């Protein structure tokens, strides 16, 4: 295959799309942080009823790293910042056991260079048992705290 870069645009996702890939929305929220412009996700009310309230939990993460967003029960708007400054920022996720939120926080940390502390990370094995080994192959670095 040949891969070429192009102008990346913000995501505009409707409820119709949500039905077929709702588990990927936390990751799309994370990626949207670095896209220029405003990404809009509509019809996402069911995210509040997953292993955690994924709208609320991703909002907490976005707030920690200084990403502007608007969230309601059925919509999320993320004001992306491709020039995000990482100094003095850290992603902390604790008290939840949602594998999708934990994976999305880890990937956001890798994309931005922001350090993260993710408790209950073993929950990632629920949907992706090889997640850490895959990240290691992609030059990610994780340290386990005791």
Cite the ranges covered by each PLM segment.
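Short, structured segments at the rim of ligand-binding sites
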Residues: 1-146
């Amino acid at each position: 295959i040949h891969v070429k870069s192009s102008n990346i645009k913000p995501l505009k996702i409707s409820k119709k799309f949500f039905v077929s890939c709702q588990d990927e929305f936390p990751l799309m929220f994370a990626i949207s942080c670095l896209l220029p412009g405003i990404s809009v996700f509509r019809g996402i009310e069911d995210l509040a009823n997953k292993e955690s309230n994924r709208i609320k939990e991703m909002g907490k993460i976005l707030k920690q790293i200084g990403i502007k967003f608007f969230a309601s029960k059925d919509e999320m708007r993320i004001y992306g910042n491709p020039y995000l400054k990482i100094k003095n920022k850290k992603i902390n996720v604790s008290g939840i056991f949602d594998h999708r939120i934990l994976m999305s926080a880890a990937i956001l940390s890798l994309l931005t260079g922001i350090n993260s502390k993710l408790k209950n990370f073993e929950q990632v094995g629920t949907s992706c048992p090889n997640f850490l080994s895959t990240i290691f192959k992609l030059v990610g670095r994780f340290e386990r705290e005791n």
